[in-house]
A protein has these predicted regions:
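C-terminal substrate-binding subdomain of Rossmann-fold SDR/epimerase-dehydratase oxidoreductases
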Residues: 16, 39, 58, 195-308
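A structural alpha-helix within SAM-dependent methyltransferase catalytic domains
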Residues: 21, 70, 107, 111, ...
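Proline-centered turn/helix-capping motifs that create local helix->coil transitions or kinks
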Residues: 116-119, 128-131, 166, 182, ...
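The catalytic Tyr-centered alpha-helix of NAD(P)H-dependent dehydrogenases
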Residues: 132, 143-150, 180, 184-188, ...
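Short aromatic-enriched loop/helix-cap "lid" or pocket-rim segments at secondary-structure transitions
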Residues: 41-44, 131-133, 182-185, 249-250, ...
């Protein structure tokens, strides 16, 4: 399979590129990335010289470039996105142009080409918050911040191309990822580094917000399964069933680094901060996937990565 991976120099995208090239000897990967704040060529160290890998620096909003690349692949996996929630609250425009309009350009190029699979990478945030129970793939979307709203818009656009153009679209919605190659502004890498140098760890509100956490390698395995075995037109939740409050995650990081809990600093909560996300995962588990890494093991690996 020849795969175009957009946003492939970012956190999850680069881990996916590494995973595919390591697990599938016959696959070829073209990585397209604009190398904005979250993308780095360093994330592709170890695969950049692989003869089955090609890196292209460019933007998914560049229609001519996208059309050219799509004409020569079997599948598209679209990770390309602006994903920093706080920045989306400060200014939504780049989130709309990349996450929605960029996806539109990819979909139109795919529809003009001969694509076997179009995997749209989404997020559990499109569902909004849930105080009890878990979200299924059939639940309505209720995004509560500009980032989530643009991802929901991209999902609906992708679904519409499957319905109206018979484009072979699949959508995944994943819980919070952590692991190697994540941007240092994100919670876990930021807190690991702060704890290591004795700086405060700013926790929103009282730290009671709950997230479901999955180690990035487990997520990459799930994405690979959906790409190859998922049913066209379907959405797949990807979760770990490991829920932790932000305060629990913070305390686990301090313990793993060997730092004192006095470094915890409670700060004003952010606007639109959803209380809890949780996902039902029966559909992806029916494809034979399940997470391998416990949170504690994944965190140990993550701490080792950032400190060494």
């Amino acid at each position: 399979m020849r795969i175009l991976v957009t946003g492939g120099a970012g956190f999850i995208g680069s881990n996916f590129v590494h995973y595919v090239l390591e697990e599938h000897d016959d696959d070829e990967v073209i990585t397209l990335d604009a190398l904005t704040y979250a993308g780095s060529k360093d994330n592709l160290d170890g695969v950049r010289d692989n003869p089955r890998h090609e890196f292209v620096e460019g933007d998914i909003r560049n229609r001519d470039l996208v059309t050219k690349l799509v004409s020569d692949v079997d599948a598209i996996v679209n990770f390309a996105a602006e994903s920093h929630v706080d920045q989306s609250i400060e200014g939504a425009k780049p989130f709309v142009t990349t996450n929605v309009q960029g996806t539109q350009i990819l979909l139109e190029a795919a529809n003009e080409g001969n694509i076997d699979r179009f995997l749209q990478i989404s997020t559990d945030e499109v569902y909004g918050q849930i105080l009890d129970g878990k979200f299924s793939e059939d639940d309505p979307l209720d995004p509560r911040n500009p980032y989530a709203a643009t991802k929901a818009g991209a999902d609906l656009l992708a679904q519409s191309f499957e319905t109206t153009h018979d484009l072979p679209v699949l959508i995944t919605r994943t819980c919070n990822n952590f692991g190697p190659r994540q941007h240092p502004e994100k919670l876990i890498p930021k807190f690991i580094r702060n704890a290591a140098v004795g700086e405060n760890l700013p926790v929103y509100g009282d730290g009671s917000n709950v997230r479901e956490w999955i180690y990035v390698e487990d997520n990459c395995r799930a994405l690979d399964v959906v790409l190859r075995e998922g049913a066209v037109g379907e959405m797949y939740n990807i979760g770990s069933h490991t829920e932790k409050t932000n305060l629990e995650v913070t305390e686990a990081i301090l313990d793993a680094v060997g730092a004192d809990e006095d470094l915890i600093e409670f700060v004003d909560d952010r606007a639109g901060h959803d209380q809890r996300y949780a996902l039902e995962t029966e559909k992806i588990e029916a494809l034979g996937w399940e997470p391998v890494y416990a949170f504690e093991e994944g965190l140990e690996r993550t701490v080792d990565y950032y400190l060494n």
